[in-house]
Amino acid sequence: MVRMNRIVQVLLLGGLVVLQGCMFTTLRNELREMKHARVLTGRVLDQVRPEANVVLVLYRQSPDGLKIVNGTLLDSAVGKFVVKVPIGTFYLFAFEDLDNDLAWDGTEPNGYYGMPDAVVVTDSSPATLSGLDIRLNASAPPPGVFPETVSLPVEALGSSIVRAGQIADLDDPIFSLDYGNMGYWRPLTFIREIGFSLFFREPFDPGKIPVLFVHGALGTPHGWKDIVDRLDPDRFQPWFYYYPSGLPLDKNAAALNWMVAELHRELGFRKLHVVAHSMGGLVARDFILKNAYESRLDVVRQFVSISSPWNGHRLTAKGVRRAPAVVPSWHDMVPDSPFIRSLFARHLPEFVTYDLLFSYRGDCRFFLENNDGTVEISSQLDMRAQREARRIYGFDEDHGSILTGAEAIAQLVRLLSAPAGSPY
């Protein structure tokens, strides 16, 4: 699932000369574009027909007038939009697509941000411009400078970069290893095609406990298949966080927290279990802290980390120093990085039960101390993580096989199924 052994190979042999230069060239170009990109966020309010699709239209001011940049079909389970834009001047328009034709005929409920107001994005703008709410009106005429009708071709229809509640099968092609690699080496392309997504395997059932699975570097939700197949389908409903693992880990955690908070507001679930593998454990812990201390929610009741590098990976320091272009998440994975220190600056909330699973079968001793083939055991068993763990379980598996090993899966299922307060 995680393929972190590829990362290890990249960070070895004379300062990352294993990789082809084109990979770093692509990464460098994406990092340059990301540096100048900003995110617009807001909510579409006062929907007349809640079951109808809502289309967000992004206009950009040009010398020739207003031009449609793209359209975004909003996720009805969340009701908010998060769109990425370059430097420029933009206007936001939304409408209810009552007849599902990707067109506004002038009669469907619609609205603009402001009167409308321009959203000016410059190099000095913050990374996120929030609060750009749009209120729909059943009879509002368009301002004179805007067209009286709007028609979007399918190819112009983008999507919100943060999406929650979509139903997907784990065998869906978007969960292939190619997409996992894209999320690591070409995170901006991944955001355009997939976004930050929280997938369901089935429609939400208030009678079942959601179990949120968080993959690691280069991973996809498909890697959880063997574990999910062992869960009690009458008691649990699996959710899967799918994110660009090359981005800074705090951004991935923030996007996850935003989605969980919105889904909690919409669906009202009372409990959430979190299971994370490898680097995903760091993302998950940061999410849990944000969810409890910033969003003030107490829904996360159980957290299980699997083979997580709690003190990072020391070879990433070599990558940060020597690579022609640095994967942003490498900075966070440097041992004792500011991000890692922030993870343990606050304790997990008292209402969260934490169990630590680690793997110890590996033979990468020329470059690493005792390891599971990818991550050093000393990082998996960092004392800061051990101190907060209720129980610690070790398995004779390597970094990837722990997700398919029978004993590890059986123990994980027991932990998830045990009554509250149980020693297991």
What residues fall within each predicted segment?
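Bacterial N-terminal signal peptides
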Residues: 10-20
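Flexible, membrane-associating and regulatory peripheral segments of lipid-active enzymes
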Residues: 23-25, 43, 47-49, 57-61, ...
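Gly/Ala-rich beta-loop-alpha elbow adjacent to hydrolase catalytic centers
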Residues: 275-276, 280, 284
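The conserved beta1-alpha1 loop
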Residues: 212-216, 277-278, 307
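Helical cap/lid subdomain of alpha/beta-hydrolase-fold lipid enzymes
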Residues: 288-424
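Bacterial Sec signal peptide processing site at the extreme N-terminus
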Residues: 22-37
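Structural motif
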Residues: 35-54, 295
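Active-site catalytic motif of lipid deacylating hydrolases and related acyltransferases
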Residues: 203-271
